[in-house]
């Protein structure tokens, strides 16, 4: 795997550490960084902070790679913002393309799920979204147990984070 851009490779390796924070939130590394740098938020919405360590600053710099290479898998919908997050199974953007409607202060996907039936609120979905988006949403299967939402890697076909797939994403983000 001959690397032509060391900056993109470095971002990919750092993104692997960021992916570890996301995929193993109970690991010692994830808990230490969370306690110090994002105690009230999650890694994807974290800020660099006032005087960050070199390690944190470096990992935080890889957030662009992680954000571009992930999308949400719907569980209970509590962590997924309807308009801002990537959560639809549409590879073009993974985001809702329907015009944004006033849906409260912070509209979450959970507001589209009926807690009694553990299924989509079909009429609400059809009334809010364009037919294309509504169809995509209603095709997303929901687990009856409504587990936590989870991030999945979309950087390759297998859905597994690799430095190679992160490198290709980093190449598109790095200024030459």
Model segments located where?
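A helix-boundary/hinge signal
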Residues: 1-176
């Amino acid at each position: 795997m001959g690397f032509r851009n060391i900056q993109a490779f470095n971002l990919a390796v750092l993104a692997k550490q960021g992916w570890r924070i996301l995929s193993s939130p109970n690991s010692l590394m994830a808990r230490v960084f969370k306690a110090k740098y994002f105690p009230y938020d999650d890694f994807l919405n974290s800020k660099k902070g006032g005087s960050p360590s070199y390690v944190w600053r470096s990992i935080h710099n890889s957030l662009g790679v992680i954000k571009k290479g992930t999308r949400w898998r719907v569980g209970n919908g509590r962590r997924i913002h309807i308009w801002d997050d990537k959560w639809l199974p549409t590879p073009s953007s993974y985001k809702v393309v329907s015009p944004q409607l006033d849906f409260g202060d912070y509209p979450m996907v959970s507001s589209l799920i009926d807690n009694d039936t553990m299924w989509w609120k079909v009429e609400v979905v059809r009334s809010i979204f364009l037919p294309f988006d509504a169809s995509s949403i209603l095709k997303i299967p929901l687990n009856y147990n409504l587990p936590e939402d989870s991030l999945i890697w979309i950087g390759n076909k297998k859905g597994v984070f690799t430095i190679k797939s992160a490198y290709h994403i980093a190449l598109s983000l790095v200024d030459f």
